[in-house]
């Protein structure tokens, strides 16, 4: 979710940045996101905006484990089972968003389809997109590539990307985290001319 908020930030305040690293993002079908947002609105009529809907949560995350061998519903996050277990044990991670939170998230994601909004990203802002090629959020790189293409179509020209074989969503705690951190450090050194 953070990568979607980061991309929205780039559209509004990218001119305040010297660069950005976007990790684990995607570009879900617009109709799907719009339908999910509409569902939140309908459910809120009956249950209120503070309701925590398991239906919306399941629709948002249910298919993420598809095609993966896993012990838990959160295995899509990481190949490192110890990290998955830490995530599952953390009450700050294992909660259901309110309808209002989902609605706000879907509204923000829908803004990322608007060329006028994307035009706010500075054309020369250095961007690095990192993703695991087994990350379901990025549709195993297809969604990440669409996100990059949308920015290029908006005239943003300084975009680099790297996809990690077998890696899933949480790259900073993946089994290849040393490689990820080295790539981040290398990109930052290049951008900062160190």
Show which residues each predicted segment covers.
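Acidic beta-to-alpha connecting loop that harbors the catalytic carboxylate
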Residues: 133-136, 167-168
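Short beta-strand/loop motif that positions the catalytic acidic residue
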Residues: 129-131
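Short, proline-enriched alpha-helix->beta-strand connector loops that line the catalytic pocket
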Residues: 121-127, 154-157
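Active-site nucleophile elbow and catalytic-triad environment of alpha/beta-hydrolase enzymes
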Residues: 97-119
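Alpha/beta-hydrolase-fold enzymes
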Residues: 6-92
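Catalytic nucleophile loop
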Residues: 2-3
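Conserved alpha/beta-hydrolase "acid-adjacent" motif
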Residues: 136-146
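Catalytic active-site module of serine/aspartate enzymes centered on a nucleophile-bearing elbow/loop
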Residues: 154, 158-194
